[in-house]
């Protein structure tokens, strides 16, 4: 009997145009880090399936978003130039779950997740979400805001952004030598919309908790 599972698929946006020859190694390392970090919450590990695409299955909707945020923040901290597009689906899988590698599984949930990834590609979106009964309209709006904040961060700012995301106190940034004064760090944090970034993440988890 088919059971419903929380599915994540992602691919690299415009991979054919990326000039960094090591981006596939970087992509693979991201999945390795995520599989290690979320070992206890992963049902079937993130597995690269089509060169520039991975899929996996996790235990709940909260983990899906924790995983997305982890991947994005790790990508920024490492200074990777590529961007990822995601499909998050709660759907049926008819075959037995492969807990070792995300291969040899079939079901309408996986089909829908792949179709969602294609929809995101065709429409220019970064996220496709279908997690019924969780209210997806609110999640989609939050993800649009989340993406709008991230899209303003330039690659040359990734080191600074990563420092802001790791350190809550502006004094820590001054100690790291990134800013001479606390006020300078505060102004940069405002321009990067770091507080708004953290707020939209909290809002997503509130929606999930009350969905």
Task: Provide a role label for each language-model segment.
Residues 1-211:
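Regulatory and interdomain segments flanking nucleotide-handling catalytic cores
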